[in-house]
Amino acid sequence: MTVASMLSSNSMNVGVSNPKMSSKTSACCLLNRPWPSSCSMSISSCGQFGVSEKSKLLCGAGALQVESAPLFSVGQKFQLDDVIEAQQFDRETLSAIFEVARSMENIRGNSSGSQMLKGYLMATLFYEPSTRTRLSFESAMKRLGGDVLTTENAREFSSAAKGETLEDTIRTVEGYSDIIVLRHFESGAARRAAATANIPVINAGDGPGQHPSQALLDVYTIEREIGKLDGIKVGLVGDLANGRTVRSLAYLLAKYRDVKLYFVSPNVVKMKDDIKEYLTSKGVEWEESSDLMEVASKCDVVYQTRIQKERFGEKLNLYEEARGKYIVNQDVLKVMQNHAVVMHPLPKLDEIEADVDNDPRAAYFRQAKNGLYIRMALLKVLLLGW
């Protein structure tokens, strides 16, 4: 049975709960409807099922509890508790997530949407500005029948402004919701939140650290646009030191065979050594270059990013030095291959000239749209399982 067929079948939903909470091994089979969050049962000794520590068994009226019931024949890779960093995914899990995302495109095309997450609440805690990530997560939740508790600027308009710790905020918010989507200005904040929470946490960007859901939609987009992931050549351009999207993308692309990455950036924002060392350890070929035209002529994907002014603090002279050095324009398009695409995590400023938008190889708005499907898939898998 494929993941998509599991998703489309309404005959049975199976999940498991935190094994720390009980010595009882149980399973919950709920017929013909998704689980509400009204009841939680616990199981332990679940290694045989590939059950991870925070997986939940959510069930409601009409649920049947059985002892030692077999679950889906899936491995540890399919148990998803949190989405914190790109390294946590293996290739099989990526393929499974993409399969669910494709099924979500059909739901998106249905004007009535879906009610599979009816009764679930998602809390968005955003300590940094966001348009696409926050709105796409909120849209994803609502299109699946769930509801949203939102904070647009938690750094200024929440108890964080009064000095409350992130951990205390998470402990409070998890009492109001079933899943937390967190964007924070500190690298590592999402990992701290996940260690604190007993509900799923999704990292929507932690400072210059990572942005795993963006990387998932990026790889999903590359596969849809280019038709393959093995053997691709990708040029990462712009702010590679502060851009969390390129870090997460590099980690994910390392899962595929015969990939080559090119790093094109001003000297002050070069790719950090930890990424280079990781790629080398995985046998991924990478090369630094100062010639965008040459790299663009070789690549399947030119992944442009903005220079992140907010990360420079008072060193604005360095920002001005970096800004405008590498711009995707008509000259770059002329040397690109016909099948190649330009991608960008957005927002874009002047690093892509406006007339590039009209070229069919400009994939960044299609890329943003794919974010909805990936985030719908993540919410479904984290809250209901496969």
From Swiss-Prot:
Gene3D superfamilies: Aspartate/ornithine carbamoyltransferase (3.40.50.1370). It catalyses: carbamoyl phosphate + L-aspartate = N-carbamoyl-L-aspartate + phosphate + H(+). Its EC number is 2.1.3.2. L-aspartate binds at residues 162, 244, 306. Its main location: plastid. Keywords: Allosteric enzyme, Chloroplast, Plastid, Pyrimidine biosynthesis, Transferase, Transit peptide. It is found in: Plastid, Chloroplast. SUPFAM superfamilies: Aspartate/ornithine carbamoyltransferase. Carbamoyl phosphate binds at residues 132-133, 183, 211, 214, 346-347. Pathway: Pyrimidine metabolism; UMP biosynthesis via de novo pathway; (S)-dihydroorotate from bicarbonate: step 2/3. Disulfide bonds: none annotated. GO terms for molecular function: amino acid binding; aspartate carbamoyltransferase activity. Residues 1-39 form a transit peptide. One of its GO terms (biological process) is 'de novo' pyrimidine nucleobase biosynthetic process. The keyword Chloroplast applies. InterPro entries: Asp/Orn_carbamoyltranf_P-bd, Asp/Orn_carbamoylTrfase, Asp/Orn_carbamoylTrfase_sf, Asp_carbamoyltransf, Asp_carbamoyltransf_Asp/Orn-bd. Feedback inhibited by UMP. GO terms for cellular component: chloroplast. UMP binds at residues 132-133, 183, 211, 244, 306. Belongs to the aspartate/ornithine carbamoyltransferase superfamily. ATCase family. Homotrimer. Catalyzes the condensation of carbamoyl phosphate and aspartate to form carbamoyl aspartate and inorganic phosphate, the committed step in the de novo pyrimidine nucleotide biosynthesis pathway. This is Aspartate carbamoyltransferase 1, chloroplastic.
